């Protein structure tokens, strides 16, 4: 019943933003970037532009984000069953 979670890239412990890769197996991957909504509340935004993208597209997006911001944290969750539910709103 465990869901494997890995820190793929360690960012700045005080100010690094988070990119979350939810690996849904054959269904694809959801890539979510940590953002703030209009009220300043923490939220998530689809990084790949779509709800699910290919693993290759997810990795390309993540690499591009790390190149832009090396302080970024990247966390990957392997969840082909879709059990993990993101906390917070997706904008």
Indicate where each model-derived feature is located.
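Phosphate-interacting basic helix/loop segments used at nucleotide- and nucleic-acid interfaces
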Residues: 1-7
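Hydrophobic/aromatic-rich, well-ordered segments within soluble, folded domains that form packed cores
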Residues: 7-39, 45, 74-79
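Helix-rich interaction surfaces within compact, conserved domain-sized segments
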Residues: 35, 42-91
């Amino acid at each position: 019943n465990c869901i494997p979670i890995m820190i793929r890239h360690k960012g700045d412990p005080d100010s690094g933003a988070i990119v979350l890769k939810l690996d849904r197996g054959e269904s694809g991957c959801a890539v979510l970037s940590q953002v703030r909504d209009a009220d300043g509340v923490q939220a998530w935004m689809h990084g790949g532009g779509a709800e699910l993208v290919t693993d290759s597209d997810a990795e390309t997006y993540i690499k591009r984000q790390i190149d832009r911001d090396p302080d970024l944290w990247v966390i990957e969750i392997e969840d082909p069953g879709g059990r993990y539910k993101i906390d917070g709103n997706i904008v």
